């Protein structure tokens, strides 16, 4: 009986310690750093700011899901602060920052950023409020490839040699007899070469890992 009471007492002490530790973590000066690390954020310059002074990047929606795509990528950002937010900026190197167009001077802002050109970069986003405090920089990835692969075919006796290249990776060589129904030959690489026998009049094309399709070539 005494042993059970002792164990119960120890359990109560442990629970109290956990509660106190949780309080310190979420209401002390290290709270923002901890939350930032849990949400993939990087360091802020406001090391001595009081809890709650810093703006917060609440949500970032990346239309690409951080995977390689062959379309425009939209970044939708929501930020808030106890003070009015004066700007939301983006950077590719954490040194050079550019302000995102939007409606500011409110405590909750939503802004949108669209990328259209080919790129493979890490994007950083931060918010600044009227007191000059900055949020932790949110990190996401932009991977766009709209450039179609290139394909060259050559004929040697009954065989056709196909050479395909791409800025990222060629994922398949496709062939068809009617330009409507295509069969895949799986490949992988920035530059690939295959030799195969095709009937005269067969159409060939290359597809890259982003889904871009090359010009069609015909076996003569």
What do the PLM-derived regions correspond to, one by one?
Residues 1-2:
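Juxtamembrane low-complexity tails/linkers enriched in Ser/Thr-Pro and polybasic
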Residues 5-12, 17-220:
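Low-complexity, disordered linker/stalk regions enriched in Pro/Thr/Ser/Gly
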């Amino acid at each position: 009986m005494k042993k059970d009471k002792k164990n119960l007492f120890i359990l109560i002490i442990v629970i109290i310690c956990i509660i106190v530790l949780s309080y310190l973590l979420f209401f002390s000066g290290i709270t923002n750093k901890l939350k930032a690390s849990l949400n993939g954020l990087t360091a802020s310059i406001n090391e001595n700011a009081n809890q709650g002074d810093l703006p917060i990047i609440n949500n970032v929606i990346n239309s690409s899901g951080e995977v390689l795509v062959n379309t425009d990528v939209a970044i939708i950002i929501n930020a808030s602060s106890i003070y009015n937010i004066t700007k939301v900026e983006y950077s590719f190197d954490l040194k050079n920052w550019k302000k995102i167009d939007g409606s500011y001077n409110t405590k909750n802002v939503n802004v949108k950023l669209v990328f259209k050109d080919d790129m493979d970069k890490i994007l950083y986003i931060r918010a600044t409020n009227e007191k000059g405090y900055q949020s932790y920089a949110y990190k996401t990835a932009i991977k766009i490839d709209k450039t179609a692969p290139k394909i060259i075919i050559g004929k040697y006796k009954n065989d056709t040699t196909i050479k395909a290249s791409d800025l990222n990776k060629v994922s398949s060589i496709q062939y068809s007899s009617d330009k409507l129904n295509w069969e895949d030959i799986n490949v992988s690489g920035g530059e690939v070469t295959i030799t195969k026998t095709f009937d005269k009049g067969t159409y060939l094309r290359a597809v890259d890992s982003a889904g871009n399709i090359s010009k069609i070539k015909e076996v003569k």
